[in-house]
Amino acid sequence: QRIERLITDYSQMLKDEVALSKEKTKKIDIEPIIKSVVDDFNNIYKVKKGINITYENDGGKKYFINGIENRIEQIIANLLDNAISFSNNNKNITVKVSKLEGKKISIDILDEGQGFKEKDTNKIFRRFYSNRPDKFGQHSGLGLNIVKNLVELHNGTINASNRIDKKGARMEVILPMV
């Protein structure tokens, strides 16, 4: 089953790479996109695992980027899926959007899971790398690599770190604002 999943995921990734090279970006406000994904995940995981996902912003009115709407959805959904996978029941996940200096937007996804082993923060974006314990199920190790590629397609960066304020992980996506 794991080999079949790897082949399927890898095949999908290759198709996505070809599709990405043909897709056109346009000016989009990422806030409603992110809120929609957060709402969708809350509808499932609040009941299923007692996990509450909150959305916060820095009070900005609009968060415009040049992007591809469904790819931004894919980035947020994949990062939330990972945060949920590493969170115990009845925990909180926060998605924060804020404007940074230099016309950039930061999207932080903060969970209350186990956090990262320091040696893993650089490896997790590699193709086929997975540090997920067996209790979380089998995974291909392609998800965060795909996210990284999608972020880079949007001329952005992604970083993984441990939270400073409490136990848990922090994934930060930085995208150029228009």
Question: Where would I find each of the regions flagged by the language model?
Answer:
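Conserved micro-motifs of the catalytic ATP-binding
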Residues: V18-E23, K62-G67
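A conserved beta-strand-to-alpha-helix junction within the catalytic ATP-binding
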Residues: K24-N42
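Short conserved segments within the C-terminal catalytic ATPase subdomain
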Residues: I44-E56
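Short helix-loop "hinge" at the ATP-lid/N-box region of the Bergerat-fold HATPase_c
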Residues: A83-I84
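Short conserved segment of the HATPase_c
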Residues: F116-F128
